[in-house]
Amino acid sequence: MSEEQRRAGLLLRTAAKTLDFILIAAVMEMVPRVGFYAGLAYLLLGDGFFDGRSLGKKLIKLKVVSANTYTPCTFRDSILRNSTFAAGYIFWLVPWIGWIVLFLVSVLEFTLVLGSKDGMRLGDEIAGTVVIETQ
């Protein structure tokens, strides 16, 4: 595996996803009526931008690629890999339950990353993607 194809660790992936959720929260607060839907769209499509990088991944220098070919993540792959977080995000509008569901989805996903020899979470398994570090 070349330097460019080094798998990203849990800490870097968590930092990138946290930055993405901060961006989503800012959009939700700034544009209340459509902010939720804009946030959902970004959550689902974000990894398809910038050659396989959401804004959070771009800042942390991570990239989502196909597990087999190492080609950048497509919008289709992004939707598939982030559908698990999107399912939790949809419950966000339900007081308390939304927070709990999103928290449980996040814990499940990050636990799977730790338990996977390839560092793949459920969303990665569904989409056939991995997250790598870049220069």
Predicted segments — roles?
Residues 1-135:
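Membrane-interfacial and juxtamembrane segments of integral membrane proteins
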